[in-house]
Curated annotation (Swiss-Prot):
One of its GO terms (cellular component) is extracellular region. One of its GO terms (molecular function) is carbonate dehydratase activity. Belongs to the alpha-carbonic anhydrase family. Keywords: Lyase, Metal-binding, Secreted, Zinc. Reversible hydration of carbon dioxide. Disulfide bonds: none annotated. It comes from the Eukaryota. InterPro entries: CA_dom, CA_dom_sf, Carbonic_anhydrase_a-class. Component of the acid-insoluble organic matrix of the aragonitic skeleton (at protein level). Its EC number is 4.2.1.1. Its cofactor is Zn(2+). This is Putative carbonic anhydrase.
Amino acid sequence: CLKRLQPGEMSLQLLLSGCRLRLEQETGVLGRFADLTRKIIQPDSDETVRFSDGIFIRGLIPQRCNTRFSRLAILNCYYTYKGSLTTPICSENVTWLIVKPRLPATNNMMRKFRRLETPAGKNPPLMCDNFRPVQPLNGRTVFEVHRI
């Protein structure tokens, strides 16, 4: 049975995914994605990054998770917890999924990501240092998912 919610009853829940990076000399798909950021540096850009540009989600999944059983979703390799946004307003309505294995990244790739810009009116306009210090758990539980 579905219930129609009234505006005062609605609540916005967010599901965000994140990853941890490991600095390396060379990378594959994530490096190609970083190269494509030149098309979308400004948020109001009319450019589009398409599948034909060679970016496939399964290529971002670390090899030890990239099996035929979990190729499109890292079902066996993540942490999850109830948390908050990392930038103001820091709302606490977020479920985080963090990829367990670290993804490879290079210094050059990180420089490309740091050129990305935020929407107009932000100062500074660059999308870097958009994090906050690690927060206390405050009674939250972090779950490590081994298998679904």
